[in-house]
Protein backbone atom coordinates (compact mmCIF):
# COMPACT_ATOMS: atom_id res chain seq x y z
CA UNK A 1 0.00 0.00 0.00
CA UNK A 2 1.17 3.51 -0.74
CA UNK A 3 1.72 6.63 1.35
CA UNK A 4 0.56 10.09 0.38
CA UNK A 5 1.83 13.48 1.53
CA UNK A 6 -0.36 16.54 0.97
CA UNK A 7 1.41 19.89 0.55
CA UNK A 8 -1.14 22.62 1.19
CA UNK A 9 -4.05 21.69 3.43
CA UNK A 10 -6.55 24.46 2.76
CA UNK A 11 -9.85 23.94 0.94
CA UNK A 12 -8.37 21.93 -1.94
CA UNK A 13 -6.02 19.83 0.19
CA UNK A 14 -8.94 18.84 2.41
CA UNK A 15 -11.16 17.97 -0.59
CA UNK A 16 -8.37 15.75 -1.94
CA UNK A 17 -7.79 14.14 1.48
CA UNK A 18 -11.47 13.17 1.74
CA UNK A 19 -11.41 11.64 -1.75
CA UNK A 20 -8.18 9.73 -0.99
CA UNK A 21 -9.68 8.33 2.24
CA UNK A 22 -12.89 7.28 0.51
CA UNK A 23 -10.99 5.59 -2.32
CA UNK A 24 -8.87 3.52 0.06
CA UNK A 25 -5.87 2.74 -2.17
CA UNK A 26 -3.38 4.86 -0.21
CA UNK A 27 -2.92 6.28 3.30
CA UNK A 28 -2.20 9.89 4.09
CA UNK A 29 1.09 9.90 5.99
CA UNK A 30 1.46 13.65 6.53
CA UNK A 31 0.19 17.06 5.51
CA UNK A 32 1.67 20.54 5.57
CA UNK A 33 0.15 24.00 5.61
CA UNK A 34 1.10 27.35 7.14
CA UNK A 35 -2.41 27.44 8.68
CA UNK A 36 -3.33 23.92 9.74
CA UNK A 37 -7.04 23.59 10.63
CA UNK A 38 -7.71 22.74 14.31
CA UNK A 39 -9.57 19.54 13.43
CA UNK A 40 -6.72 18.11 11.31
CA UNK A 41 -6.47 14.37 12.02
CA UNK A 42 -3.24 13.76 10.10
CA UNK A 43 0.38 14.10 11.23
CA UNK A 44 1.66 17.57 10.32
CA UNK A 45 5.04 18.02 8.60
CA UNK A 46 7.23 21.08 9.16
CA UNK A 47 7.56 22.06 5.50
CA UNK A 48 6.68 21.22 1.92
CA UNK A 49 10.19 19.91 1.35
CA UNK A 50 10.00 17.58 4.34
CA UNK A 51 7.07 15.83 2.66
CA UNK A 52 8.76 15.70 -0.75
CA UNK A 53 12.01 14.35 0.75
CA UNK A 54 10.32 11.76 3.01
CA UNK A 55 11.51 8.32 1.77
CA UNK A 56 8.29 6.68 3.05
CA UNK A 57 6.07 8.88 0.88
CA UNK A 58 5.30 7.55 -2.61
CA UNK A 59 2.78 10.13 -3.81
CA UNK A 60 2.75 13.90 -3.36
CA UNK A 61 -0.35 16.09 -3.74
CA UNK A 62 0.42 19.76 -4.40
CA UNK A 63 -2.47 22.01 -3.32
CA UNK A 64 -0.40 25.16 -2.96
CA UNK A 65 -0.38 28.81 -4.05
CA UNK A 66 0.30 28.96 -7.80
CA UNK A 67 3.95 30.03 -7.64
CA UNK A 68 4.93 26.75 -5.93
CA UNK A 69 3.40 24.53 -8.60
CA UNK A 70 6.27 24.40 -11.09
CA UNK A 71 9.27 24.17 -8.72
CA UNK A 72 7.63 21.70 -6.32
CA UNK A 73 6.33 19.48 -9.15
CA UNK A 74 9.88 19.30 -10.53
CA UNK A 75 11.33 18.68 -7.07
CA UNK A 76 8.84 15.88 -6.29
CA UNK A 77 9.35 14.13 -9.64
CA UNK A 78 13.13 14.28 -9.14
CA UNK A 79 12.62 12.76 -5.68
CA UNK A 80 10.91 9.80 -7.37
CA UNK A 81 7.35 10.63 -6.31
CA UNK A 82 4.14 10.37 -8.29
CA UNK A 83 2.63 13.85 -8.40
CA UNK A 84 -0.91 15.19 -8.42
CA UNK A 85 -0.89 18.98 -8.79
CA UNK A 86 -3.76 21.47 -8.78
CA UNK A 87 -4.19 23.91 -11.64
CA UNK A 88 -2.67 26.09 -12.93
CA UNK A 89 0.25 23.80 -13.82
CA UNK A 90 2.57 26.82 -14.04
CA UNK A 91 2.61 30.37 -15.43
CA UNK A 92 3.31 29.64 -19.12
CA UNK A 93 3.54 26.94 -21.77
CA UNK A 94 7.35 27.06 -21.57
CA UNK A 95 7.09 26.26 -17.85
CA UNK A 96 5.08 23.14 -18.72
CA UNK A 97 7.71 22.08 -21.27
CA UNK A 98 10.36 22.38 -18.55
CA UNK A 99 8.24 20.19 -16.27
CA UNK A 100 7.70 17.63 -19.05
CA UNK A 101 11.44 17.09 -19.46
CA UNK A 102 11.68 16.11 -15.80
CA UNK A 103 8.47 14.06 -16.01
CA UNK A 104 9.82 11.98 -18.91
CA UNK A 105 13.13 11.37 -17.15
CA UNK A 106 11.39 10.36 -13.90
CA UNK A 107 9.02 7.74 -15.30
CA UNK A 108 6.52 8.77 -12.61
CA UNK A 109 2.85 9.67 -12.98
CA UNK A 110 2.07 13.39 -13.19
CA UNK A 111 -1.56 14.48 -13.25
CA UNK A 112 -3.15 17.92 -13.00
CA UNK A 113 -6.43 18.73 -11.30
CA UNK A 114 -8.87 19.70 -14.03
CA UNK A 115 -11.90 18.34 -12.22
CA UNK A 116 -14.48 20.05 -14.45
CA UNK A 117 -13.91 17.35 -17.10
CA UNK A 118 -15.31 14.83 -14.60
CA UNK A 119 -18.67 16.53 -14.03
CA UNK A 120 -21.64 14.41 -15.07
CA UNK A 121 -22.97 16.96 -17.56
CA UNK A 122 -19.57 17.41 -19.23
CA UNK A 123 -19.20 13.64 -19.53
CA UNK A 124 -22.58 13.49 -21.27
CA UNK A 125 -21.70 16.38 -23.60
CA UNK A 126 -18.41 14.75 -24.60
CA UNK A 127 -20.12 11.45 -25.40
CA UNK A 128 -22.67 13.24 -27.62
CA UNK A 129 -19.92 15.15 -29.46
CA UNK A 130 -17.95 11.92 -29.99
CA UNK A 131 -21.04 10.01 -31.16
CA UNK A 132 -21.44 12.59 -33.96
CA UNK A 133 -25.20 12.19 -33.49
CA UNK A 134 -25.62 15.89 -34.24
CA UNK A 135 -22.72 16.16 -36.68
CA UNK A 136 -19.71 18.41 -36.12
CA UNK A 137 -19.36 21.29 -33.69
CA UNK A 138 -19.94 24.67 -35.34
CA UNK A 139 -19.37 26.97 -32.37
CA UNK A 140 -19.17 27.14 -28.59
CA UNK A 141 -19.98 30.02 -26.28
CA UNK A 142 -18.88 30.02 -22.65
CA UNK A 143 -19.16 32.21 -19.57
CA UNK A 144 -17.73 31.55 -16.13
CA UNK A 145 -17.70 34.07 -13.35
CA UNK A 146 -17.58 34.67 -9.63
CA UNK A 147 -17.05 37.58 -7.29
CA UNK A 148 -14.34 38.01 -4.68
CA UNK A 149 -14.41 40.18 -1.59
CA UNK A 150 -11.99 42.84 -0.37
CA UNK A 151 -9.95 40.23 1.54
CA UNK A 152 -8.86 38.97 -1.85
CA UNK A 153 -6.47 41.92 -2.12
CA UNK A 154 -4.58 40.72 0.97
CA UNK A 155 -3.87 37.23 -0.39
CA UNK A 156 -1.21 35.80 -2.71
CA UNK A 157 -3.86 35.75 -5.46
CA UNK A 158 -3.64 39.54 -5.78
CA UNK A 159 0.11 39.53 -6.48
CA UNK A 160 1.18 38.89 -10.05
CA UNK A 161 4.51 37.26 -9.12
CA UNK A 162 2.72 34.78 -6.81
CA UNK A 163 -0.49 34.14 -8.77
CA UNK A 164 0.88 34.40 -12.31
CA UNK A 165 -2.31 36.08 -13.51
CA UNK A 166 -5.86 36.84 -12.50
CA UNK A 167 -9.25 35.25 -13.11
CA UNK A 168 -8.21 33.49 -16.34
CA UNK A 169 -5.49 31.49 -14.60
CA UNK A 170 -7.64 30.96 -11.51
CA UNK A 171 -11.04 29.98 -12.94
CA UNK A 172 -11.17 30.63 -16.69
CA UNK A 173 -8.52 27.93 -17.21
CA UNK A 174 -11.21 25.32 -16.43
CA UNK A 175 -13.49 26.63 -19.17
CA UNK A 176 -10.66 26.81 -21.72
CA UNK A 177 -9.78 23.22 -20.80
CA UNK A 178 -13.40 22.16 -21.45
CA UNK A 179 -13.47 23.88 -24.86
CA UNK A 180 -10.26 22.04 -25.83
CA UNK A 181 -11.66 18.77 -24.44
CA UNK A 182 -14.94 18.96 -26.34
CA UNK A 183 -13.42 19.94 -29.71
CA UNK A 184 -10.34 17.77 -29.39
CA UNK A 185 -8.43 20.38 -31.43
CA UNK A 186 -6.36 23.40 -30.39
CA UNK A 187 -7.24 26.99 -31.27
CA UNK A 188 -4.59 28.73 -33.34
CA UNK A 189 -6.25 32.12 -33.78
CA UNK A 190 -7.08 34.23 -30.74
CA UNK A 191 -8.45 37.72 -30.13
CA UNK A 192 -8.71 38.93 -26.55
CA UNK A 193 -9.40 41.87 -24.31
CA UNK A 194 -8.04 41.67 -20.79
CA UNK A 195 -8.93 44.27 -18.15
CA UNK A 196 -8.81 45.07 -14.43
CA UNK A 197 -11.21 48.00 -14.25
CA UNK A 198 -12.76 47.08 -10.92
CA UNK A 199 -10.05 45.76 -8.57
CA UNK A 200 -7.30 47.63 -10.47
CA UNK A 201 -4.66 45.17 -9.25
CA UNK A 202 -1.47 45.38 -11.35
CA UNK A 203 -1.08 42.30 -13.55
CA UNK A 204 -4.20 40.65 -12.09
CA UNK A 205 -7.03 40.82 -14.60
CA UNK A 206 -10.61 40.71 -13.36
CA UNK A 207 -12.16 40.24 -16.83
CA UNK A 208 -11.16 38.46 -20.02
CA UNK A 209 -13.18 38.36 -23.21
CA UNK A 210 -11.64 36.06 -25.81
CA UNK A 211 -12.70 34.63 -29.14
CA UNK A 212 -10.80 31.72 -30.61
CA UNK A 213 -10.83 29.76 -33.83
CA UNK A 214 -9.28 26.63 -35.22
CA UNK A 215 -8.41 27.82 -38.71
CA UNK A 216 -8.52 24.29 -40.17
CA UNK A 217 -11.89 23.16 -38.83
CA UNK A 218 -13.40 26.63 -38.55
CA UNK A 219 -14.71 25.82 -35.06
CA UNK A 220 -15.07 29.11 -33.21
CA UNK A 221 -15.47 29.61 -29.46
CA UNK A 222 -15.87 32.50 -27.08
CA UNK A 223 -15.11 32.75 -23.39
CA UNK A 224 -15.88 35.42 -20.84
CA UNK A 225 -13.94 34.83 -17.62
CA UNK A 226 -14.75 37.27 -14.85
CA UNK A 227 -14.40 37.98 -11.15
CA UNK A 228 -16.96 40.80 -11.26
CA UNK A 229 -19.92 38.44 -11.73
CA UNK A 230 -21.85 39.46 -8.63
CA UNK A 231 -24.16 36.48 -9.03
CA UNK A 232 -21.99 33.46 -9.84
CA UNK A 233 -22.47 31.92 -13.26
CA UNK A 234 -21.43 28.90 -15.30
CA UNK A 235 -22.72 28.53 -18.85
CA UNK A 236 -21.43 26.45 -21.76
CA UNK A 237 -23.26 26.19 -25.09
CA UNK A 238 -22.21 23.85 -27.89
CA UNK A 239 -24.01 24.11 -31.23
CA UNK A 240 -23.59 21.42 -33.84
CA UNK A 241 -24.86 20.89 -37.39
CA UNK A 242 -28.03 19.08 -36.33
CA UNK A 243 -28.52 19.91 -32.68
CA UNK A 244 -27.20 21.63 -29.59
CA UNK A 245 -26.33 21.22 -25.92
CA UNK A 246 -26.61 23.96 -23.35
CA UNK A 247 -25.22 23.53 -19.85
CA UNK A 248 -26.27 26.10 -17.27
CA UNK A 249 -25.06 25.81 -13.70
CA UNK A 250 -22.47 23.56 -12.13
CA UNK A 251 -22.83 21.34 -9.08
CA UNK A 252 -20.06 22.57 -6.77
CA UNK A 253 -19.19 22.52 -3.09
CA UNK A 254 -20.17 26.20 -2.75
CA UNK A 255 -23.56 25.61 -4.39
CA UNK A 256 -23.44 29.15 -5.79
CA UNK A 257 -23.51 28.23 -9.49
CA UNK A 258 -27.02 26.75 -9.36
CA UNK A 259 -28.20 23.32 -10.42
CA UNK A 260 -26.17 21.55 -13.12
CA UNK A 261 -28.80 21.43 -15.86
CA UNK A 262 -27.99 20.17 -19.34
CA UNK A 263 -30.47 20.86 -22.12
CA UNK A 264 -30.08 18.73 -25.23
CA UNK A 265 -31.94 18.94 -28.53
CA UNK A 266 -33.74 15.68 -29.09
CA UNK A 267 -32.94 13.47 -32.06
CA UNK A 268 -35.93 14.64 -34.02
CA UNK A 269 -34.93 18.27 -33.71
CA UNK A 270 -33.70 19.58 -37.01
CA UNK A 271 -32.28 22.98 -37.64
CA UNK A 272 -33.49 25.65 -38.14
CA UNK A 273 -36.80 25.38 -36.29
CA UNK A 274 -36.30 23.93 -32.82
CA UNK A 275 -38.49 25.00 -29.91
CA UNK A 276 -38.16 24.29 -26.21
CA UNK A 277 -40.61 21.38 -26.67
CA UNK A 278 -37.95 19.58 -28.69
CA UNK A 279 -35.49 19.42 -25.79
CA UNK A 280 -34.60 16.94 -23.10
CA UNK A 281 -33.37 18.23 -19.75
CA UNK A 282 -30.99 16.41 -17.48
CA UNK A 283 -30.15 17.59 -13.98
CA UNK A 284 -26.99 16.30 -12.32
CA UNK A 285 -27.36 16.26 -8.54
CA UNK A 286 -24.01 14.84 -7.45
CA UNK A 287 -20.53 16.30 -7.93
CA UNK A 288 -18.62 13.10 -8.73
CA UNK A 289 -15.60 14.99 -10.08
CA UNK A 290 -13.28 14.76 -7.05
CA UNK A 291 -13.82 11.03 -6.52
CA UNK A 292 -13.46 10.37 -10.23
CA UNK A 293 -10.14 12.26 -10.48
CA UNK A 294 -8.63 10.33 -7.58
CA UNK A 295 -9.83 7.06 -9.11
CA UNK A 296 -8.18 7.89 -12.45
CA UNK A 297 -4.96 9.08 -10.81
CA UNK A 298 -4.62 5.97 -8.64
CA UNK A 299 -5.38 3.77 -11.66
CA UNK A 300 -2.35 5.31 -13.39
CA UNK A 301 -0.16 4.93 -10.28
CA UNK A 302 -1.25 1.37 -9.54
CA UNK A 303 -1.78 -0.10 -13.01
CA UNK A 304 0.33 2.15 -15.21
CA UNK A 305 -2.75 3.38 -17.07
CA UNK A 306 -1.86 6.38 -19.25
CA UNK A 307 -3.04 9.71 -17.84
CA UNK A 308 -6.18 10.38 -19.87
CA UNK A 309 -7.39 13.51 -18.09
CA UNK A 310 -5.14 16.24 -16.72
CA UNK A 311 -2.02 15.02 -18.52
CA UNK A 312 0.96 17.34 -18.95
CA UNK A 313 0.17 17.44 -22.69
CA UNK A 314 -3.31 18.77 -21.92
CA UNK A 315 -1.77 21.21 -19.44
CA UNK A 316 0.56 22.37 -22.23
CA UNK A 317 -2.39 22.89 -24.59
CA UNK A 318 -4.36 25.02 -22.16
CA UNK A 319 -1.31 27.03 -21.07
CA UNK A 320 -0.42 27.68 -24.73
CA UNK A 321 -3.93 29.05 -25.22
CA UNK A 322 -3.63 31.23 -22.10
CA UNK A 323 -0.27 32.54 -23.38
CA UNK A 324 -1.96 33.47 -26.67
CA UNK A 325 -4.79 35.28 -24.87
CA UNK A 326 -2.46 37.32 -22.66
CA UNK A 327 -0.09 38.05 -25.58
CA UNK A 328 -2.85 39.12 -27.93
CA UNK A 329 -4.07 41.61 -25.38
CA UNK A 330 -0.55 43.02 -24.90
CA UNK A 331 -0.08 43.47 -28.63
CA UNK A 332 -3.10 45.73 -28.97
CA UNK A 333 -1.44 49.12 -28.80
CA UNK A 334 -3.57 51.66 -26.93
CA UNK A 335 -2.69 54.33 -29.51
CA UNK A 336 -3.22 52.08 -32.52
CA UNK A 337 -5.52 54.55 -34.30
CA UNK A 338 -2.86 57.29 -34.16
CA UNK A 339 -0.21 54.92 -35.47
CA UNK A 340 -2.43 53.89 -38.38
CA UNK A 341 -3.15 57.54 -39.24
CA UNK A 342 0.57 58.30 -39.24
CA UNK A 343 1.20 55.37 -41.57
CA UNK A 344 -1.53 56.56 -43.92
CA UNK A 345 -0.01 60.09 -43.94
CA UNK A 346 3.44 58.67 -44.69
CA UNK A 347 2.05 56.60 -47.55
CA UNK A 348 0.22 59.57 -49.04
Predicted ranges, named:
Residues 1-40:
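N-terminal Rossmann-like dinucleotide-binding module
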Residues 85-86, 110-112, 247:
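Hydrophobic residues in well-ordered beta-strands that form the structural core
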Residues 98-115, 135-140:
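Rossmann-fold dehydrogenase core element
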Amino acid sequence: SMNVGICGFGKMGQIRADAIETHGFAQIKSVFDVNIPDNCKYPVANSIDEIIEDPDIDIVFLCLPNYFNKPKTIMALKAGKHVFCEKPPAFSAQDVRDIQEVERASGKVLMYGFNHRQHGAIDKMKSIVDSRKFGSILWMRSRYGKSVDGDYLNTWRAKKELAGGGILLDQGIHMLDLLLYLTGKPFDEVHAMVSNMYWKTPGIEDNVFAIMRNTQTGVTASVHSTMTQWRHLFSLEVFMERGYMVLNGLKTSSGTYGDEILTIAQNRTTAPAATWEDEERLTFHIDQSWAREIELFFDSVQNGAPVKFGSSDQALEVMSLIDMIYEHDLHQAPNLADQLNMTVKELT
